[in-house]
Amino acid sequence: MFDYLENEEVVLDELKQMLRDRDPNDTRNQFKNNALHAYLFNEHCNNVEVVKLLLDSGTNPLHKNWRQFTPIEEYTNSRHVKVNKDIAMALLEATGYSNINDFNIFSYMKSKNVDVDLIKVLVEHGFDLSVKCENHRSVIENYVMTDDPVPEIIDLFIENGCSVLYEDDEYGYVYDDYQPRNCGTVLHLYIIAHLYSESDTRAYVRPEVVKCLINHGIKPSSIDKNYCTALQYYIKSSHIDIDIVKLLMKGIDNTAYSYIDDLTCCTRGIMADYLNSDYRYNKDVDLDLVKLFLENGKPYGIMCSIVPLWRNDKETISLILKTMNSDVLQHILIEYMTFGDIDIPLVECMLEYGAVVNKEAIHRYFRNINIDSYTMKYLLKKEGGDAVNHLDDGEIPIGHLCESNYGCYNFYTYTYKKGLCDMSYVCPILSTINICLPYLKDINMIDKRGETLLHKAVRYNKQSLVSLLLESGSDVNIRSNNGYTCITIAINESRNIELLKMLLCHKPTLDCVIDSLSEVSNIVDNAYAIKQCIKYTMIIDDCTSSKIPESISQRYNDYIDLCNQELNEMKKIMVGGNTMFSLIFTEHGAKIIHRYANNPELRAYYESKQNKIYVEAYDIISDAIVKHNKIHKTIIKSVDDNTYISNLPYTIKYKIFEQQ
């Protein structure tokens, strides 16, 4: 009988005959099945009268077989049987619905004949809707992933306890493979499961289902662990309905938002994904859909979405730019100025469709960490260059270049010393600044803090830039609103002796240096810098010691005395009608000192090496001797020349050749 029930087309009369001789509750078989188990496992099980006959014959509907399944549990777990509503009802009613939670609702939902009335019966008689399936998904989560979920059943599940709004305390899962928040909302699951129609029975995303889920409080703006909204998945669909797109846009205030994918390092987002053929199912872009995204997108997101695709799909991006109004396009151009490497053909395309390179665009480009001289030259030419003369929110535009290391480029001290002509190959930032300087009407323009470009360059330790600015006419003596000079900044903030020496070489006024010393924050730790300033001021005025701040003069009194001693000694030594001091420390002396290279007094002083502080005097004399010897050799060689110079007196020849 059991073999008959399990494998044959069961006929009621034949079964009645068998039941006269056999016990339907005889479970002495391999699988411990009773007669109900056997029939419900039959792939031809579709006759409710057979089930009723077995029940009327006393078959136990609550008996558990070897898998610990009751008949209804075996029936709803069978993969090759379509659940018949009448059979299920007969099994439930036979136990007074005590076996209701043996009903495998997950298997049932996967079948093609889900009956709303049967679901209602289950719900009305207390079916536990909080049950989870093997992959730990809930009833509603599994149902929306079936081939063609029905809004009425979704309503039924949700209204009777299936939660679709995850609370923070609901994530007590210990499973690594699934957590609700990771997979986003139920709306995410529905969209992802219906992106592509794999068979005739599997429906595309339907607007009525989307509306149903949204009406139950699911926010389309919610994101999953990949930062994706449901709409971001939907635009990958093989069949996109613009009305569904509008539904999924609810609550998303920027459909052009973008982010960098941690795994691929690509720009992602709703609009970015749709424009990227790697994420889009259909080959062609729907411009109506793009316009919808543009209308609800913000300029920065739009820019981030289209720029990465420019190189690979210029035609599409050009078409998109052409559809924008000029105001939006202008905003996009301005945002693009700080994006990274600027592609001039893309800028040209934006300009063609109504954008302009204006002051704001230039100012934004100064904030670009990948700034380059070629692009700057192009932009300034388009704008006219006046933008560099206007403050950017109280800041000097060029000053932004001083603030950080742009890209992988640094400012090298030797760059400027080797000449600006090669600068573009060594340091793009210096080259860029050099391009801007001719447009700058006042190199000493001040920002909202009263600081100049030189102040910024010193503060950020840009030695080559400091050198460039000084050679271009920057004033060392300007004080900021808080009274700080570049010298003060070099001592207190940069702590860069080379910068300090560079500033002192450009001859700041005595008052500037004295004021700078007054602002030194730590007269102990900055001893070397302070001594450099004292050393410089003593050359300018031997009465400086009375003007130096008292705290410094007291601490460095011995150093001041030694400076005075060395300088006074130099002033006593006469060399051909000039003092040693004037030859070494005055502009006139610098022009004639080589003429006295063989003077005994100069030689004696040079060979004594007695200075402890003003040791540079010996380098100056050494250079003068080298220059004198070079001139002398040139004169000796000219004796053999048959020219008018060879017949001139030695002193005349000397004056001629020293000009060379």
Swiss-Prot record:
Residues 578-658 are annotated as: PRANC/F-box-like. Keywords: ANK repeat, Host-virus interaction, Inhibition of host NF-kappa-B by virus, Modulation of host cell cycle by virus, Modulation of host E3 ubiquitin ligases by virus, Modulation of host ubiquitin pathway by virus, Repeat, Ubl conjugation pathway. ANK repeats lie at residues 31-64, 101-131, 135-166, 190-222, 226-257, 268-302, 325-359, 449-478, 482-512. It holds the Pfam family Ank_2. The keyword Signal does not apply. It comes from the Viruses. GO terms for biological process: symbiont-mediated perturbation of host cell cycle progression; symbiont-mediated perturbation of host ubiquitin-like protein modification; symbiont-mediated suppression of host NF-kappaB cascade. Belongs to the orthopoxvirus OPG023 family. Substrate-specific adapter of SKP1-containing E3 ubiquitin-protein ligases which mediate the ubiquitination and subsequent proteasomal degradation of host target proteins. Prevents activation and subsequent nuclear localization of NF-kappa-B in infected cells, by targeting NF-kappa-B RELA subunit to the SCF E3 ligase complex. Interacts (via N-terminus) with host RELA. Interacts (via PRANC/F-box-like domain) with the SKP1 component of the host SCF ubiquitin ligase complex. This is Ankyrin repeat domain-containing protein OPG023.
